[in-house]
């Protein structure tokens, strides 16, 4: 990877019929393992680029620097249709979703969802949503993602891949205090990893990210533990 000018790596997705793979960036373990330091972002210790690969040649064809709008691009997902050229990447710290289309030799990359940061008195900067996971339903109809700090999971209709439309939102834990108790219990942490059932009707959500980050942002989780929550999804009308 050093010969390819790739400083960090994290997630990847590939479409063999398109001879294409997309990879993302996080940071070096020595940066994120102790916890999150905002100053590390300004020191370029976290990634902000995505890379498009030629699978056969095992070479990077194109690298996109997502800039300030694309800080820490972790998860990437493409549509499940093996002939599709559409995909998404979630910029965790910037809390934006980018759409990409690899149909042309020069891929198109565009921000299509912006989760606004919120001013709060307990955080030194406007609180980002912190998008930690994204997924596409098996029928390629919906995009889901989790905002770990805000505390919501969202569902978007992606029938038109480059123009997602919000169709559902559920609150689970989070720092904004908007989430209800579940079965009489306050949920520690926020929606982090998500997995959808094959029929698309149940979204499973866990609330722990990484122990040092859990302790930093959700200290109550150390004693109360994390949780797994199931969210019922409307696959016909959205929501």
What are these regions (language model features)?
Residues 7-11, 72-78, 123-137, 181-198:
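Signature of short aromatic-glycine-proline-rich micro-motifs recurring in repeat-based ectodomains
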Residues 17-19, 83-85, 139-141, 199-201:
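Short coil/turn segments that connect the beta-strands within blades of beta-propeller domains
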Residues 27-28, 93, 149, 159, ...:
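Residue-level signature of beta-propeller blades and closely related beta-rich strand-turn architectures
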Residues 44-49, 94, 150, 164, ...:
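A detector of repeated loop/turn-to-beta-strand junctions in beta-rich toroidal repeat architectures
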Residues 52-58, 99-112, 155-167, 218-220, ...:
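Short loop/turn segments immediately following beta-strands, especially the blade-tip
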């Amino acid at each position: 990877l050093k010969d390819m000018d790739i400083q960090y790596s994290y997630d990847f997705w590939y479409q063999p019929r398109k001879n294409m793979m997309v990879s993302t960036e996080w940071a070096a373990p020595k940066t994120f393992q102790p916890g999150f330091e905002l100053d590390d972002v300004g020191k370029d210790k976290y990634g902000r680029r995505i890379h498009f690969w030629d699978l056969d040649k095992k070479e990077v064809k194109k690298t996109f620097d997502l800039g300030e709008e694309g800080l820490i691009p972790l998860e990437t997902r493409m549509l499940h249709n093996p002939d599709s050229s559409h995909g998404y990447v979630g910029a965790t710290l910037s809390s934006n979703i980018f759409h990409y289309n690899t149909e042309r030799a020069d891929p198109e990359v565009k921000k299509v969802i912006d989760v606004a940061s919120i001013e709060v008195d307990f955080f030194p900067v406007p609180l980002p949503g912190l998008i930690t996971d994204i997924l596409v339903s098996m029928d390629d109809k919906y995009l889901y993602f989790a905002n770990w700090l805000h505390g919501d999971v969202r569902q978007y209709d992606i029938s038109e891949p480059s123009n997602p439309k919000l169709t559902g939102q559920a609150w689970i834990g989070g720092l904004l205090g908007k989430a209800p108790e579940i079965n009489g219990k306050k949920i520690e942490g926020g929606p982090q990893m998500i997995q959808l059932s094959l029929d698309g009707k149940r979204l499973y959500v866990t609330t722990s990210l990484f122990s040092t980050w859990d302790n930093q942002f959700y200290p109550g989780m150390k004693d109360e533990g994390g949780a797994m929550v199931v969210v019922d999804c409307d696959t016909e009308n959205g929501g």
